[in-house]
Amino acid sequence: YLVDFEEPDVFRYRIAGTEISETFGHGNLKGKTLSDILSPSGRDFVTNRWLPVIREGAIVCMKGQVYNSMNRYAFGERQLLPLADEPDGPITGLLGVTVSKWVERLGPVERRNSDMVMFPAAKVP
């Protein structure tokens, strides 16, 4: 998925794969913000996890529970990379890749946030 950033803290999908769109009950996420597809608490949670990409130029790697819905959840890995319109310009969005496997819920399951590691993209050789 490719997501544009708008100040102060809005993430808007430019493009997303079919599986991600269907996860959120939409045929197409183009132009949708996190507020359009998530509850207010879900939007705040994702925004806080994505903001280091924009504010710090961080590459973010996550592993564990990467999606959570009413009747199933997904475990896997996710990487978020900062994007800029110009080589030394401000970060204007992110590129995300998620690989996961869905598991059906058999009963109440406590949400466990995925583990997250960040490092500066500028440090990558």
Locate the predicted segments by residue.
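Signal-transducing coiled-coil/dimerization helices and immediately adjacent hinge/linker segments
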Residues: M116-P125
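Sensory/regulatory domains in signal-transduction proteins
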Residues: Y1-M116
